[in-house]
Amino acid sequence: KLRNFVQNISSKNNFKHIVNIGIGGSDLGPLMVNKALKSFYKVPDILYVSNIDPTKISEIFIKCNPKETLFIVTSKSFSTLETLENAKIVAEWLSKHKVALNDSMVAVTSLRKKALDWGFNDSNIFEISENVGGRYSLWSSVGMSIFIGLGEDNYKKFLLGARTMDEHFINEEVENNIPIILALLRIWNRNFLNRNNHCIVPYTDNLSKLPAWAQQLEMESNGKSVDINGATLKMPASPIIWGEVGTNAQHSFFQFLHQGLEVSPIDILVPRKPLSLIYFKGSEKNHEYLLINAIAQAEALATGSVDLINQNKNFLGGRPSTIISWEENTPFSIGMLIALYENITIASGFLWNINSFDQWGVELGKTIANKISNDKNDKDLTPAAKNFLNQR
């Protein structure tokens, strides 16, 4: 069904803009891939709306023609407040411009009936399994914007890259199994060396969104305090994941990485070649600078430097980094890289004996917000929260 829909869109070429409305796993994954593989995208413009802040949706309305824009409403539960509120605003905007909802909006959800009740035709609803967590869902219909953008041939290569890494994870012996080795390193740093954070620095601007995606992947999966049996963990699980694109990060927080008292294990991600699709005179030289900087930072973190006269110039070294490298940014290689990080998270969770596929920690805040919004009742709130609400 998804394939036929995407083929139909591509053949008719009616839409100049594709807008994905979703949050969390319904946004971060597709957005990250869009940025990573933009050079391969066939659709002129794919945009993403996640926050309920009206600023973003207003920008969409200014930029887009309602008759030439497809909106993908992505919510597994079809009850996500931010997503549905943005979808309501879009539906009103389309109606104002005499555009029928089902001509310009589709729904991606695991609860088909809710989407039907909302007003979507059955042909405009694309279901995902209720068992697939949002942060692992970009391979499903949640990745519709990826499929539309890449086109069928490149989308298949993207999926094949992920499958290749998954099969490596499942079949390879432990001593040569890349996700398991990196998961063991993560646990070694987290639990034995007490390093509570892990930095990811991609030396390619295409992967500037990967640290934020990896942050959700690891911290929502493994940010737990009890194991699968409900017993309190004896050691902490997920490290804090953070990062930024290199070389920008070198002029930002690398001072902390090199000389701060807190040691941060770091993944340095770098393709060995510039993307052949965007070759221009000087591109190879610029890319060589990226490679050199990536290697130099890993070397400096490892070896350090001693200045006996000026202690401010001392670099202690012994700071762990892992260089993860591939040929160039293609649908296949990016698919492999994404699956690599997924499998690191899964393997780590297995070794910590926790459930990496639930996320109850996100529910309490939503429950309280819904209670305040629906019941207008603040009697159970703290004095500070009541005071803040009364200032509205």
Residue ranges and their predicted role:
Residues 29, 57, 73-76, 80-94, ...:
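Extended, hydrophobic alpha-helical segments in both membrane/secreted and soluble proteins
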Residues 258-261, 270-330, 334:
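Substrate-recognition/cap regions that form aromatic- and gly/pro-loop-enriched pockets
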Residues 1-16, 60-69, 185-196, 257-262:
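Glycine-rich phosphate/diphosphate-binding loops that line cofactor/substrate pockets in enzymes
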Residues 17-21, 70, 106, 199:
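Conserved beta-strand elements of the Class I
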Residues 1-12, 283-303, 326, 348, ...:
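Extended, charge-enriched "interface" segments that sit outside catalytic cores
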Residues 28-43, 63-65, 88-95, 119-125:
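A glycine- and small-aliphatic-rich helix-loop capping segment at beta-alpha/alpha-beta transitions
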Residues 1-9, 33-34, 39-70:
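Glycine-rich oxoanion-binding loops at beta->alpha junctions
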Residues 93-278, 317, 364-370, 377-392:
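Active-site phosphate/pyrophosphate-binding segments
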